Amino acid sequence: MKDPILKEAELRMKKSVEAIDEELKKLRTGRPSPALLEEIKIDYYGVPTPINQVATINVTEERSLIIKPWEKNLLSAIEKAIQASDLGLNPTNDGNVVRLVFPSPTTEQRQKWVKKTKEIVEHGKIAVRNIRRDVIKELKEMTKNGEISEDDEKRLEKEVQNLTDKYIEELDKLFERKEKEIMEF
């Protein structure tokens, strides 16, 4: 049976990795992705609403997104929201859809994105290590209070370290995958 402390640590580490993965999906890579628009909201009858809840977003060709709102009166609001965002893209509105064309990124832009990816992944690693630190601190406290033996403490510390190594490795794989995606031409 797995110790409850280890279960909780693993769950927290897994959630940290998942959060980093989600954050990386939103990072621009030069390749169009509907996830880039998830954070952009428009005013929909007085309520800030994500674009993906009022329109269909499709990837077309190699470097463009087509945003087709369910109500045509939202076209200009979507266009303005994208222009106001930090995506650095210029939407075109043809009366039916909003088209986002992604220009080929320069090598400098790609390097900047890789650097940003590395920062995001590093935050994930720090989170995983902080979880390890908290668990080890808790184990030492339990040993001090006589709840577990020193042998159990050492065994559990080793297992926590193994979990940490596993999730750090997962984060490294996420980075490598994203870096490869960014550097593709």
Swiss-Prot record:
Main localization, broad class: cytoplasm
A Gene Ontology cellular-component term: cytoplasm
Location relative to the cell: Cytoplasm
Keywords assigned by UniProt, alphabetized: Cytoplasm, Protein biosynthesis
GO-annotated biological processes: translational termination
Pfam family for this entry, one: RRF
Superkingdom of source: Bacteria
UniProt-recorded Gene Ontology molecular function terms: ribosomal large subunit binding
UniProt feature coiled coil, ranges: none
SUPFAM superfamilies with a match to the protein in the record: Ribosome recycling factor, RRF
Protein family (similarity comment): Belongs to the RRF family.
Role: Responsible for the release of ribosomes from messenger RNA at the termination of protein biosynthesis. May increase the efficiency of translation by recycling ribosomes from one round of translation to another.
Name of this chain's protein: Ribosome-recycling factor
Higher taxonomy: Bacteria, Thermotogati, Thermotogota, Thermotogae, Thermotogales
Gene behind the chain: frr
